[in-house]
């Protein structure tokens, strides 16, 4: 996951702080100098880092901290609180109109950011909440994008409105909203065209759609792997088109993660969701406090619980528990169990949410298998079980 390198560096810095019985002003300043370097290496915006360190230092170098019985923990607590504040303090929901009123959401972003896939993921989120979403293919320049949206929409059980590549995006948007009104859809999501870079034609097209269609929310999808470029892209879109929030994709990859720590501070716009994988279910609501906790190696147990609740049926869990107690746990139960683990993101994803088990924590001392190898072994085991003949005592 992104932040693994940053997390490891920060935890090593704080480990040294915790080892000191008392802290001097020089100790705090030396530690914060290392924190500053770690944040810059993670590609966090320089101005953001400078203000962050200043805020932490003002709070950390004080009588309450220095005279505390656990000054190291107090400094870590301050860093955690300032990091949460940096990323937005509280979770921001996408504002949706109540009942049958139609909410129009325009998705924007550069090519390769994962905008079309994210659009389908978002539609699935809304459907799960009881909304009736309509996906609209407004990318008339890339036929593959229309096909991709249609395929993913079908997988999510969401209707996709398309008029091919010979219509203007603004006309498609208008027709889609009329279709939504006539067919009781209450959430219209416009998948607009991406470009290889920010250009005037792209911006003007988005501005035209906003001017002619009552867009309620404009959401920008940015690739977290592009680091500071993601922040620059967000700033450009916000200045020229106006955005209401950001979705960060590919945060599960080997990225430095600086964009997540910079976007809110630079643009003033919240991060709404983060993409944590390629599956259509791999879209997580962004919680600043939970993300800060992950970065500092404190885990994210709440998200783990939510994933478990979403994937594991309570009655089946009790039934499985009873089987284990009676020594009746069989291969069918094992297959069901492994399926639930996979749906939660796999063993690596689960372990990363446990306190101290990120790469910067205790996990580095544990021999963990390669995720691809572990997945292959799991599939092999499942295939062996599926190939077994059912044995009965009457055979």
Feature roles, as predicted:
Residues 357-379:
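Small-residue-rich helix-loop
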Residues 6-138, 145-165, 172-182, 186-192:
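Primarily NTPase-proximal linker/entry elements flanking Walker-type ATP/GTP-binding cores
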Residues 391-395:
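Conserved small/polar residues in nucleotide/adenosyl-binding loops
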Residues 377-390:
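C-terminal accessory/binding modules appended to enzymatic or scaffolding proteins
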Residues 204-223:
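Inter-motif core of Ras-like GTPase G domains
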Residues 145-146, 197-203, 230-231:
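Conserved ATPase-coupling elements of RecA-like P-loop NTPase cores
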Residues 197, 217-329:
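Conserved phosphate-handling catalytic cores of large alpha/beta enzymes
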């Amino acid at each position: 996951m992104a932040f693994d390198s940053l997390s490891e560096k920060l935890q090593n810095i704080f480990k040294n702080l915790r080892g000191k019985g008392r802290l001097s002003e020089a100790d705090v300043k030396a530690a914060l100098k290392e924190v500053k370097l770690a944040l810059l290496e993670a590609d966090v915006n320089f101005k953001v880092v400078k203000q962050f360190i200043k805020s932490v230092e003002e709070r950390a170098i004080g009588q309450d901290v220095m005279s505390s019985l656990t000054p190291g923990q107090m400094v870590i607590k301050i860093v955690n609180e300032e990091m949460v504040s940096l990323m937005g303090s509280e979770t921001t929901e996408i504002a949706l109109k109540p009942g049958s009123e139609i909410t129009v959401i325009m998705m924007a972003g550069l090519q390769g950011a994962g905008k079309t896939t994210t659009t389908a993921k978002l539609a699935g989120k809304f459907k799960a909440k009881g909304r009736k979403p309509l996906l609209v293919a407004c990318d008339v320049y890339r036929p593959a994008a229309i096909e991709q949206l249609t395929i993913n929409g079908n997988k999510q059980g969401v209707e996709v409105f398309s008029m091919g590549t010979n219509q203007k995006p603004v006309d498609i948007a208008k027709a889609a909203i009329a279709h939504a009104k006539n067919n009781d859809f209450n959430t219209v999501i416009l998948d607009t065209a991406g470009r290889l870079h920010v250009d005037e034609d792209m911006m003007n097209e988005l501005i035209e759609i906003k001017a002619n269609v009552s867009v309620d929310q404009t959401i920008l999808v940015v690739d977290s792997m592009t680091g500071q470029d993601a922040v620059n892209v967000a700033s450009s879109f916000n200045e020229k088109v106006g955005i209401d929030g950001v979705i960060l994709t590919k945060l599960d990859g080997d990225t430095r993660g600086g964009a997540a720590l910079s976007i809110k501070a630079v643009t003033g716009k919240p991060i709404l969701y983060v993409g944590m994988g390629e599956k259509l279910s791999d879209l997580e609501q962004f919680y600043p406090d939970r993300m800060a906790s992950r970065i500092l190696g404190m885990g994210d147990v709440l998200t783990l619980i939510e994933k478990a609740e979403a994937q594991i049926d309570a009655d089946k869990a009790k039934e499985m528990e009873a089987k284990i107690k009676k020594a009746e746990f069989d291969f069918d139960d094992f297959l069901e169990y492994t399926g639930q683990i996979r749906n939660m993101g796999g063993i690596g994803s689960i372990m990363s949410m446990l306190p101290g088990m990120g790469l910067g924590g205790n996990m580095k001392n544990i021999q963990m298998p390669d995720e691809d190898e572990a997945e292959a072994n799991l599939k092999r085991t499942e295939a062996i079980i599926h190939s077994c003949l059912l044995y009965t005592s009457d055979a």
